[in-house]
Amino acid sequence: MDKMKYNFTCRLFTDTKCFGPGVAQLLHTVDRLHSLRAAAAEMEMAYSKAWNIIRNSEAALGFKLLHSSTGGKGGGGAFLTEDAVKLLTAYEGFCASMRDYGDSIFDDAFGWLERKL
């Protein structure tokens, strides 16, 4: 029998879900590629869906996540706002701490069950 495990997904909420692993991944990809369109393509997501994810998250959070400019002679691009960088850093640190805590208490909570499997 396989060893028992747990799964933890970290999501932030206001009145609605506003930030989670999908938004974080999208922002990291935009940061690397400097383009929401390229990030959406790499993640095999429609560009319109990527924009909806960003807009919904921005609306729930109350601040912008991206600075963007349309294409043209110099080309367009998208860059994370200072608030987006702070949010990503805080979110990832918080999630890592929660996973560490979960790991530390998992055996205490379920070790007895592990012996029965």
What function would you assign to each model-found segment?
Residues 2-15:
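Short, Lys/Arg-enriched N-terminal segment that forms or immediately precedes the first helix
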Residues 59-64:
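Residue cluster at the C-terminal edge of the helix-turn-helix DNA-binding motif
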Residues 53:
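Residues within the DNA-recognition helix of helix-turn-helix
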Residues 68-93:
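Basic, amphipathic "hinge/linker" alpha-helix immediately C-terminal to the N-terminal HTH DNA-binding motif
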Residues 30-40:
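Short helix-boundary/capping micro-motifs
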Residues 86-117:
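Helix-turn-helix/homeodomain-like alpha-helical modules used for DNA recognition
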Residues 44-46:
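Central "turn" residue of the DNA-binding helix-turn-helix
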